[in-house]
Amino acid sequence: MKDLRYPIGQFTYVGTITEEIIDKWIQEIEDLPNELARAIKDLDQKQLDTPYRVGGWTVRQVVHHVVDSHMNSYIRFKLAMTEKNPTIKPYKEEKWAELPDSKLPVDVSLVMLDSLHKRWVNLLYSLEPADLEKTFNHPESGETKLAAAIGLYAWHGRHHTAHITSLRERLNW
């Protein structure tokens, strides 16, 4: 049985990150709000409150987490664009997933995600090759170039969408 935590595998990229790859990743980030909305379409409240795996987050928490994570990423990009290798602040995503706003209707986060991604994608398409080399420093994972971060967050959106779609497949929803 495959690892339900990583339905599309973990993020890895080896090789040169070309303009074509960057464009593909940005397109995936742009598509995420619609893909995530499609993944949860017609789910009822009980289904939204079903964990995607034993010990995992509920579908509702996954949707809210994606927005939390991508808001943080958007800020990290802006920091890297305006400061030299800023040290970003990590957050405890597992604790954020337990906060009261993670019980709100998923539509709240879908609207936020759509608006956030419109702004983020606009910023991403404006990046010049030199901008893609800019970095931020994560206290736990170290220095990250913006080019690689684009790939990581494209993967992140697909990863969590796959949590939901694979659950739907397993349970015949």
Curated annotation (Swiss-Prot):
Enzyme Commission number(s) of this protein: 3.-.-.-
Organism of provenance: Bacillus mycoides (strain KBAB4)
Positions of transmembrane segments: none
One Gene Ontology term, aspect cellular component: cytoplasm
Keywords, alphabetical: Cytoplasm, Hydrolase, Metal-binding, Zinc
Primary residence: cytoplasm
Pfam family name, one: DinB_2
Entry protein name: Putative metal-dependent hydrolase BcerKBAB4_2443
Gene Ontology MF, one: hydrolase activity
Protein family membership: Belongs to the metal hydrolase YfiT family.
Function as written in the Swiss-Prot or TrEMBL entry: Possible metal-dependent hydrolase.
SS bond partners: none
Names of required cofactors: Zn(2+)
The UniProt record lists the keyword Ligase: no
